[in-house]
Amino acid sequence: MTWLSGLYFISIASLVFCVIGLILSGIILISRKFLVKTHACKLKINDDDSLTKTVDSGRTLLSSLLDSGIPIPSPCGGKATCKQCKVKIVKNADQPLETDRATFSKQQLEQGWRLSCQTKVQHDMCLEIEERYLNASSWEGTVVSNDNVATFIKELVVSVSPEHPIPYKPGGYLQIRVPPYKTNTSDWKQTMAPEYYSDWEHFNLFDRTIDNSLLELDSANKAYSLASYPAELPVIKFNIRIATPPFINNAPNPEIPWGICSSYIFSLKPGDKITVSGPYGESFMKENNRPLIFLIGGAGSSFGRSHILDLLLNKHSTRDITLWYGARSLKENIYQEEYEKLEKDFSNFHYHLVLSEPLPEDIDSGWDKNDPEKTNFLFRAFELGQLSKLSNPEDYLYYVCGPPLHNSSILKLLDNYGVERSSIILDDFGS
């Protein structure tokens, strides 16, 4: 009976531990509500009394505006890396922070320009906000599906009301609102095909509890490029990569948290409700006759798909369009069948798939590991397969989206070939 006694003791200890955790969580919540003193602050916008908002002190200006129905874009999720949540405080601006000094000129700082994700609301302020942000809106959507399309990338499909369509453009993005939540990564198997389990098990990623139940509302909203194009409304799509902690001995570092927004999205199931705001974006299509080259890697597939499908299926463009897409292996490739069909249906569309680390089964299926235009880093394959053969590379428009190293490699390569920065449309969320 000794082992039963030990099991009983462990069960009691676990129960006590859980109860203590709940009590401490309750104390924190109560303390925040009753002990942290806040006061009402007025935010006067564009010198228009009708736009004045009353908010509680202590929160960031970004979250205060969002909660007041003015969703300022913050693609990086409030980490001060994308530099897009700029607001001009024309009265009662606090001293600039280091993040502000790294973003704005001395003259701009004196004029009151600040990053709203870093600015705390402590008193009344007068703000100047661009009209396009005042016209942004929020929508509630229902998750249709949330399946893995690669080992660490999901395709989130959401249905919004057809009566209130989102007026977005291809290449645009929406912010996803993150509420307080708690999840366990083993539950994510419900929306993950078994073929992806082995890599998650190899890195010990299952059975990890991610507790953001005390998350301050609107403190971690993040923007994601749309993978859909407007003709697909009322359905919208995103490709979203999970932000895991760095690995130590094939396991996530327990000292570093998982990505707040990506973990929330990976926990979503069909039928769940989510809130998005926007639309935003600058990386739209330039309407001219210049030929197009898309250089896309990983979850940048969202950006590429939105533009390419709109050009071919909606606008019936006759422009020459080339897509170079880079993935590690065939298992990590996204939208291959869709692009291969487009290549058959449209003579002006050309699709090149490049694998950096093809698996043995990829080689067995016929993938040529010795062809440097197929097995390589994407920027090298692109140079060998197309760029070095162009007589006038500066005549093309280049749409670039992918991981930071992908983006920097492509930009350096194009610069080496004399391509002006104005001919490169980069979708980069400051990651």
Curated annotation (Swiss-Prot):
Its cofactor is [2Fe-2S] cluster; FAD. Residues 136-286 form the FAD-binding FR-type domain. Residues 41-133 form the 2Fe-2S ferredoxin-type domain. It is found in: Cell inner membrane. InterPro entries: 2Fe-2S_ferredoxin-like_sf, 2Fe-2S_ferredoxin-type, Beta-grasp_dom_sf, FAD-bd_FR_type, FNR_nucleotide-bd, NqrF, Riboflavin_synthase-like_b-brl. It is a single-pass membrane protein. This is Na(+)-translocating NADH-quinone reductase subunit F. The gene is nqrF.
